[in-house]
């Protein structure tokens, strides 16, 4: 839950399952309330400026922060440890991934790929994406400071004493 610039509170979530409109293949949904402890009402989904659902990369496990009036949405998921697949395997498995993630073969096999931790800035309406998606942690972590703690899911963002902390579940699940 995050307080918008309008003083209302916004809850971001992903629906899963056949009856939901999200999960691994849909948009991030938004609910709104006048107080942080509910009762929230469905507002809509995070969308592009043209009104279409925002679905760059895999939209999953959203977290939002109001950073001095700038609304930032963090989201994403990746393959579990041991399942980070080379490009040729992604290409061969793309029909399965297309169904699970609702992404095209081109999106799945291209670089940087559909998996990873990402961020966008939202407009004051708390739904419309203002900036292009940016990958904040590399999917391929070998040789980086993330090598032992590659991103899996569970985006959470904090700002403490002017420093940002991105907290997540790693592929080692800790």
Report residues per predicted region.
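Carbohydrate-active catalytic/glycan-binding domains of CAZyme proteins
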Residues: 1-174
């Amino acid at each position: 839950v995050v307080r918008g610039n309008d003083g209302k509170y916004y809850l971001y979530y992903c629906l899963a399952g056949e009856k939901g409109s999200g999960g691994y293949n849909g948009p991030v949904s938004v609910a709104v309330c006048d107080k942080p402890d509910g009762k929230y009402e469905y507002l809509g989904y995070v969308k592009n400026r043209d009104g279409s659902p925002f679905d760059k990369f895999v939209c999953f496990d959203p977290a939002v922060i109001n950073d001095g009036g700038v609304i930032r949405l963090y989201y994403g998921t990746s393959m579990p440890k041991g399942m980070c697949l080379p490009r040729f395997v992604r290409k061969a498995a793309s029909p399965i991934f297309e169904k699970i993630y609702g992404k095209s073969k081109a999106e799945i096999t291209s670089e940087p790929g559909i998996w990873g931790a990402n961020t966008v800035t939202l407009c004051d309406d708390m739904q419309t994406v203002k900036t292009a998606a940016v990958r904040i942690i590399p999917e391929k972590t070998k040789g980086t400071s993330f090598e032992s703690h590659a991103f899996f899911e569970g985006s959470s963002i904090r700002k403490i004493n002017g420093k940002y902390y991105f907290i997540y579940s790693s592929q080692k699940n800790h």
